[in-house]
């Protein structure tokens, strides 16, 4: 369904602009997303997960030669942080891939792939059920040799892929990641980043109002984008901000349904991130799915650290000179 395109020089320039950022928490604190979520395979899709799988890519700068680690917070499903629908009965696998095809393989970046088998070389897979020793604790993949990641020229780095998949059960597994240079602490990989092409996450509950931020990146070939979202329950609004957009509204979905809306892209938005602001006043948490495609139906990435920095609207101020 999706066609894959290279991003040419704009992605590289934006990545270099973002390099000083050091926090590789996923979700990143600046996004204000509560947690990632993946439901068990027997779950009702109306609970907010369309395919019971989630893929994240982790980018290592080309200069990195020391080992890196991908840490998973609360990987089990059955504790106080998870969405249990009764007695805990859910297993979740976390599978790590590297090498050729990890990023470039068929449908590797497709948010709704017809072939669910991940591409790349499987480095390690770990399955978790209800395991108290991991409740609210960290599990670490690694050490990872940076040279085991697939080279991605347009990023000037190498990429690993971590796929979370709900295997059995009907509970929601809430978890987070951290890209680290330490197996026991969260120490950021300088110049690293993480990104996904389909984001399944939890909007936090609020007593008044809360806003989360998603940062899709726009390469220099994009003329228009289509945002697609699933199961928002008509419980949030979407406003799009960028250097050229000052809160343009987007369409949001109802319960158990997909919806979408299209936005034109200005030339000055190329090589920068957009700021999708989702605002909710719902007193209960809400799980949902988001992805963005361009005019060719090619998926665009959401970066944890927005490439080019957080976008800010640029006002056009006309100045008249009186002689």
Please identify what each model-predicted range represents.
Residues 44-46, 110-154, 258-271:
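Extended, solvent-exposed segments with strong compositional bias
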Residues 8-17:
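Bacterial N-terminal signal peptides
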Residues 19-23:
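Sec/Tat signal peptide C-region and signal peptidase I cleavage site
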Residues 42-53, 200-206:
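Extracellular beta-rich ligand/substrate-recognition surface
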Residues 1-9:
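Bacterial N-terminal signal peptides that target proteins for export
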Residues 51, 62-69, 218-223:
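Extended extracellular/luminal ectodomain segments enriched in beta-structured repeat modules
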Residues 24-31, 56, 84-103, 134-252, ...:
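C-terminal edge strands of extracellular/lumenal beta-sandwich accessory domains
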Residues 24-48:
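N-terminal leader/pro-regions and domain N-caps
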């Amino acid at each position: 369904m999706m066609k894959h395109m290279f991003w040419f020089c704009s992605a590289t320039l934006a990545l270099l602009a973002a390099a000083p950022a050091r926090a590789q928490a996923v979700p990143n604190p600046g996004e204000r997303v509560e947690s990632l979520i993946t439901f068990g395979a027997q779950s009702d899709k109306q609970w907010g997960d369309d395919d019971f799988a989630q893929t994240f890519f982790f980018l290592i700068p080309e200069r990195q030669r020391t080992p890196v680690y991908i840490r998973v917070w609360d990987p089990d499903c059955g504790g106080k942080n998870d969405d249990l629908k009764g007695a805990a009965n859910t297993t979740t696998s976390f599978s790590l891939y590297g090498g050729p095809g990890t990023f470039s393989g068929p449908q590797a970046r497709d948010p709704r792939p017809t072939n669910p088998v991940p591409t790349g070389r499987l480095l390690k897979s770990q399955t978790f059920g209800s395991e108290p020793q991991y409740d609210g604790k960290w599990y670490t993949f690694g050490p990872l040799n940076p040279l085991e990641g697939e080279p991605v020229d347009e990023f000037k780095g190498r990429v690993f892929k971590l796929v979370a998949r709900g295997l059995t059960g009907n509970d929601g597994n809430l978890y987070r990641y951290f890209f680290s240079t330490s197996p026991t602490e969260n120490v950021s990989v300088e110049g690293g980043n993480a990104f996904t092409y389909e984001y399944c996450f939890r909007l936090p509950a609020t007593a008044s109002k809360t806003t989360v931020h998603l940062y899709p990146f726009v390469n220099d070939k994009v003329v228009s984008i289509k945002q697609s979202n699933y199961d928002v329950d008509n419980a949030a609004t979407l406003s799009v901000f960028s250097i050229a957009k000052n809160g343009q509204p987007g369409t949001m979905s109802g319960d158990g349904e997909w919806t979408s809306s299209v936005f034109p892209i200005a030339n000055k938005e190329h090589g920068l991130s957009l700021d999708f602001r989702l605002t909710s006043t719902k007193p209960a948490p809400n799980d949902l799915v988001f992805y963005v495609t361009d005019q060719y139906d090619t998926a665009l990435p959401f970066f944890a650290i927005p490439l080019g920095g957080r976008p800010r609207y640029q006002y056009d101020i006309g100045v008249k000179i009186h002689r």
